[in-house]
């Protein structure tokens, strides 16, 4: 009762009533609209990733054209004729005791055997490259699965393909973290966070070293032709080393196929992804005012090598990217700028 009374407050006019309705109007659907209703897909990133995987799968799958079938049929007929003629020559040489002709037949058989063996080896390596895309799809399915039993077998197969020994600390931590009550999604997620980063770290180091060598070579060398040859050789070597890290043995045709897939992946991603990864701070640093033209060209070549390595890493990994574990081009850019500043 000791509190003073508050003064009276007078308003000049009446209170304004909000004329806008607080609730939206009712929306009803008839039977035809209800039957044709389809929910909207909100996950655009997964849709884009699915489009990229579809393009990669189409590129990996050989095109069965009529000319290809005719060529393969002709080669098969020619091979059968060569084998039949060789058998006939060998029988005639044995009957006539023509040891020179018999030696020539033996040499021809060795050459044909070596050729067939190389073709089979190339086909096996190319098939292994195609299987990596299917393994990535299987891993994506397991990451959304609530079943049990398949995840551990799948991860053990990946570790064996990558050459990870059973006594490796990362693999031992993974074995200690899993138990029988976990489903396939949890088992594969643990493998992706405990074992897979070991290979990813080695691939990142290879990309950083190749990008730095390309940057310094372009910044120092005055010969453009030598620069182009060096960059091409380093990029091919980088793709080979990344594929070897992830347990993929490349032959001649599989190496060309992987290089084609990397370039196709870069072209499919477009320039928007490049701008998003590099960021707007590229222009804000005003490199042209502080570095020479050759140094700026070297940084551009290094970024191209790094982007090539990232895409090769993405195609050779047996697991899809989870959370934010995908390497960013901006991280390599900062390293390249620092190395150029220290060198020049």
From Swiss-Prot:
Q: How does it sit in the membrane?
A: Multi-pass membrane protein
**Pfam families this protein is in?**
DUF697 (PF05128)
Which segments does the topology annotation call Periplasmic? 1-69, 121-212
The subcellular localization recorded is: Cell inner membrane
Where on the tree of life does the source sit, at the highest rank?
Bacteria
Q: Which residues cross the membrane?
A: 70-90, 100-120, 213-233
Q: Which InterPro entries does the protein's record reference? A: DUF697, UPF0283
HAMAP family in the cross-refs: UPF0283
Family per record: Belongs to the UPF0283 family.
UniProt name for this protein: UPF0283 membrane protein YcjF
Name the encoding gene, please: ycjF
